């Protein structure tokens, strides 16, 4: 896989912003088939920084019920499962897109 196929998007939330500022951790949504080595290599190639470590989390899908305007359930479905990567960088390194 290429680097652009591995890194899907950055995660920008209040929690990830505080982690980025305090302990220099960046959070990304990544391809479900990617492993730690591939994610680290993609970060190094795309952003020119060297990751110290990388943790991956599999986020399971959740069941959802589609409700009509009157409040009656009209269908069932589920969200997609996806993978999240926590990338730890050195204190002097920084990714500029954030």
Curated annotation (Swiss-Prot):
Claim: Coiled coil is one of the keywords in the record: no
Lineage: Bacteria, Pseudomonadati, Spirochaetota, Spirochaetia, Spirochaetales
A GO term for molecular function: structural constituent of ribosome
Functional description taken from the UniProt entry: One of the early assembly proteins it binds 23S rRNA. One of the proteins that surrounds the polypeptide exit tunnel on the outside of the ribosome. Forms the main docking site for trigger factor binding to the ribosome.
Protein's name in the database: Large ribosomal subunit protein uL23
Natural source organism: Borrelia garinii subsp. bavariensis (strain ATCC BAA-2496 / DSM 23469 / PBi) (Borreliella bavariensis)
InterPro entries: Nucleotide-bd_a/b_plait_sf, Ribosomal_uL23-like, Ribosomal_uL23/eL15/eS24_sf
Membership in a protein family: Belongs to the universal ribosomal protein uL23 family.
GO terms of biological process kind: translation
Subunit record text: Part of the 50S ribosomal subunit. Contacts protein L29, and trigger factor when it is bound to the ribosome.
NCBIfam families cross-referenced by the UniProt entry: PRK05738.2-4
Cellular component GO terms, alphabetical: ribonucleoprotein complex; ribosome
Pfam families given in the database record: Ribosomal_L23
Keywords on record: Ribonucleoprotein, Ribosomal protein, RNA-binding, rRNA-binding
Gene symbol of the encoding locus: rplW
Record carries keyword Nucleotidyltransferase: no
HAMAP family, per the entry: Ribosomal_uL23_B (MF_01369_B)
């Amino acid at each position: 896989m290429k680097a652009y196929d591995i890194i899907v998007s950055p995660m920008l939330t209040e929690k990830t912003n505080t982690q980025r500022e305090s302990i220099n951790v960046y959070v990304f949504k990544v391809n479900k088939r990617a492993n730690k080595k591939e994610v680290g290599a993609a970060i190094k190639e795309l952003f020119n920084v060297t990751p110290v470590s990388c943790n991956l989390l599999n986020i399971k899908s959740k069941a959802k019920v589609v409700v009509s305007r009157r409040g009656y359930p009209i269908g069932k479905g589920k969200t997609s499962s996806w993978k999240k990567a926590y990338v730890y960088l050195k204190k002097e390194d920084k990714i500029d897109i954030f």
